[in-house]
């Protein structure tokens, strides 16, 4: 099966920017990791993960690029990458650069991958944004880091890739209290109640954060939980009694 990925038409239209939100197809892994598992922290053999990551890079024609990733920790920590940067997996959840040939990557399996690009300044970014990073301000941290190397807020476009959506994202009462206390603005519109159960709308919350950061936001509308044939999902695997799960990769690079 071929490597497949989703794209934003807005990001695709920006010169010199290549990007992809990858599905789980086209890799070499098997079982619950079938098949393009790109998570080195999983129990999948590392050789499989390395091959899968290489296939993702190659699918975008970025074989000559250097791949950067993170030890994702649900934070607002963002790193600025240049030619002197090491490709060690530093703890954090965001990467930005203005250098060519630096492929920035994040992993997801329900948490949102968000890819950023300034339409004229040649600045890009990639963020991993679960609910903790979202309410703590990962979007604004990304925007500030991009602007520090030449981007302008009015020219930044952010695209939310495959992530868990509201109908699949049941949360507990204590989550609602944390959401309200950490957000600093009214959050009722992002919660839906049905039969004494609460459901959180992570993509809409991220779009609101984009709006508050004065950048353009877009959601591809891809539910990782629901689209079982296309994406890995931590929550879906948990509900199926599985203790492990694969991770899909999202990439962006200046060429």
Where are these regions (language model features)?
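Active-site microenvironment for binding and transforming phosphate-containing groups
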Residues: 1-255
């Amino acid at each position: 099966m071929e490597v497949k990925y989703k794209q934003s038409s807005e990001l695709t239209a920006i010169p010199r920017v290549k990007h992809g939100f990858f599905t789980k197809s086209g890799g070499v892994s098997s079982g619950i990791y079938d098949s393009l598992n790109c998570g080195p922290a999983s129990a999948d053999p590392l050789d499989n993960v390395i091959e899968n990551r290489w296939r993702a890079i190659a699918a975008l024609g970025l074989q000559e690029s250097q791949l950067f990733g993170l030890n994702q920790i649900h934070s607002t920590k963002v790193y600025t990458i240049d030619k002197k940067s090491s490709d060690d997996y530093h703890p954090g959840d965001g990467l930005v650069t203005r250098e060519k040939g630096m492929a920035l990557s994040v992993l997801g399996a329900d948490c949102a991958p968000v890819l950023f690009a300034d339409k004229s300044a040649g600045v890009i970014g990639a963020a991993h944004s679960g609910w903790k990073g979202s309410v703590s301000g990962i979007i604004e941290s990304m925007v500030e880091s991009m602007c520090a190397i030449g981007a302008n807020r009015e020219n930044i476009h952010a695209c939310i890739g495959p992530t868990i959506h509201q109908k699949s994202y049941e949360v507990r009462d204590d989550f609602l209290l944390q959401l309200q206390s950490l957000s600093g603005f009214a959050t009722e519109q992002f919660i839906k109640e049905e039969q004494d159960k609460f459901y959180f709308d992570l993509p809409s919350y991220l779009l609101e954060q984009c709006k508050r950061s004065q950048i353009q936001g877009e959601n591809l509308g891809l539910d990782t939980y629901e689209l079982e044939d296309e994406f890995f999902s931590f929550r879906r695997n948990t509900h199926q009694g599985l203790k492990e799960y694969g991770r899909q990769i999202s990439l962006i690079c200046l060429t």
